[in-house]
Amino acid sequence: TLISLEEDFNPEDFDIVMFGGGQDYEQTVVAKDLQNKKDALIQYIEDNGVVVAICGGFQLLGRYYVNASGERLNGISAIDVCTNGQFPNRLIGDVEIVNEEFGETYLGYENHIGRTYLGKNMKPLGKVVKGFGNNEEDHVEGCHYKNVFCSYFHGPILVRNQHLADRIIETAAERQRSKNA
């Protein structure tokens, strides 16, 4: 099921939410519309809903995103991250991370200009072995909060990381079973 601009988000209708990204103009449009879905999305996340958010989706789940022209776009603050975007170089290339919680290695391809910083109580999706990750400073990539899996892996995260895809599907299935019990 797709949710378009100006449509409501009903948390009960979804087992897994996929939230992708876009260019700055599109993110500006989505950021404004997302404020109307904010409470329902936060409820879904806090009720252990499963979310996979890539790049712009990751950024807009956070507190704010500063685009390339310096405009600050409010996120929905579902996760404690912020993204700054005033940088001369993009972070591009293959990336490898290790998720110590699950004992898994994830592979991907990153291509982003924003630099994302995790709040003190946020866990990364993994520690960077190769590549840049969220920024060039703290050597972590993505964010994992409850059943929310955020990443800058464009290339394609679930296809290249079957164990992560299986974990996400099983988490959603278990959540559905517990709701129906």
PLM region spans:
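N-terminal beta1-alpha1 cap of cysteine-dependent amidohydrolase-like domains
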Residues: 1-47, 159-181
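Short coil/turn connectors at secondary-structure junctions
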Residues: 13-14, 47-49, 71-74, 103-106, ...
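Structural motif
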Residues: 16-20, 52, 152
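Cysteine-nucleophile active-site neighborhood
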Residues: 23-99
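Short, acidic Gly/Pro/Ser/Thr-rich loop/turn segments
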Residues: 24-26, 86, 115-118, 156-160
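A residue-level structural signature of the nucleotidyltransferase/glycosyltransferase Rossmann-like core
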Residues: 50-51, 108, 141, 150
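Pocket-forming structural segment of enzyme catalytic cores
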Residues: 66-141
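A glycine-centered loop/beta-turn motif at secondary-structure junctions
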Residues: 135-171
